Amino acid sequence: MLFRHLVLIISTLMVANTAWSANLPPREKFKRPDSIPAPLSNPLTLEKATLGKTLFFDQRLSRSGGMACATCHSPDQRWSDGRTLPLQAESVSNARRTPTVLNSAWLSALMWDGRATTLEEQAVLPITTAHEMNFDLASLVSRLQRIEGYRPLFTQAFGDDSISQQRITQALASFQRTLVSNIAPFDRWVAGDEQAISESAKRGFAVFNDKNKANCVACHSSWRFTDDSFHDIGLPSKDLGRGAKVPSQVTLMQHAFKTPSLRDLSIDGPYMHDGSIRGLKTVIKHYKSEAIQRESLSKDMQKFELSNLEESDLIAFIQSLDGGALKIQAPMMPE
């Protein structure tokens, strides 16, 4: 009798396991790429990336000389700043959380509202924004031209020591393209290592992809877990996001923001474009039932129910996307 009971339990577990496994998409959809993309107008080279790294960490790119790109995009904070709102942005209307620059080589739209389409274009924005680095590019070029130590770096990167706005942005973009997430346990599982992630994470992957459950994959797709598109997810914010950059009649873009990647998230946030949510449980709670209902709300924002186990499994899966901090030592500053 005991034997038959054990057989029944094992059979039930096998059927359940087969059921959720059958719903999984092919792992290949989430396989990491083998190379880093770069535009033909700015081929990726070690020399340009090395120059870009120095510029990225140099506080002299700001008017005050006290803020670098790395101030808000720190290696110690998953290439963000760990803050709800950026430094000096507390008084800014509709301030937005600092996004990570990890895996930005693959982005087709940058900034939360997609106002930049290339890393080269984006590199200008924080330098010239008043509540960020608050500089002008002509003055920056003049400042760097007076720093003798930069001349050999520009020569190695571009063939001569001429310093220009274009070369500065190309170098910064090149360095950012080299910032790629470390291999995560999920990546090893995708590659065939069945022991790389827990059974809980595997079940969470099923919940993540199940249209009748969380259906996170509707927006968080591809190996970076983003569709690179814009969605209104029903946050109580007056910020129009992408809607302020397109004609007002484009209703779906009102309150819409770029889908962030789920790779290498910090343990407790802050999350969302405005840093308004901390903790993955609170994020799940929002998606389950707390989105503000309005005309622009994404069609993928459908209420759903999860058991406590399914929530825990979903969080375990998201945590399996963490490859650990991409540590880079700050370079010596040229004089």
From Swiss-Prot:
Which Gene Ontology terms of cellular component type are present?
Answer: periplasmic space
Q: Does the keyword Nucleotide-binding apply?
A: no
Q: Which InterPro entries does the entry mention?
A: Cyt_c-like_dom, Cyt_c-like_dom_sf, Cytochrome_c_Peroxidase/MauG, Di-haem_cyt_c_peroxidsae, MauG/Cytc_peroxidase, Methylamine_utilis_MauG
Which species is the source of this protein? Methylophilus methylotrophus (Bacterium W3A1)
Q: In which pathway does it act?
A: One-carbon metabolism; methylamine degradation
PTM field: Binds 2 heme c groups covalently per subunit.
One of the entry's Gene Ontology molecular-function terms is: calcium ion binding
> What role does it play?
Involved in methylamine metabolism. Essential for the maturation of the beta subunit of MADH, presumably via a step in the biosynthesis of tryptophan tryptophylquinone (TTQ), the cofactor of MADH.
EC number of the protein: 1.-.-.-
Residue positions binding heme c 1 = 69, 72-73, 273
What broad class of enzyme is this?
oxidoreductase
Question: Where found in the cell?
Answer: Periplasm
Which keywords describe this protein according to UniProt?
A: Electron transport, Heme, Iron, Metal-binding, Oxidoreductase, Periplasm, Signal, Transport
Chain positions recorded as heme c 2 binding sites: 216, 219-220
Q: Tell me, in one coarse class, where this protein mainly resides.
A: periplasm
**By its UniProt entry, which Pfam families does this protein fall under?**
CCP_MauG
Q: What is this protein called?
A: Methylamine utilization protein MauG
As given in the record, the signal peptide range reads 1-18
From what superkingdom does this record's organism come? Bacteria
* Gene Ontology biological process: methylamine metabolic process
Q: Which Gene3D superfamilies match?
A: Cytochrome c-like domain (1.10.760.10)
Report the gene name. mauG
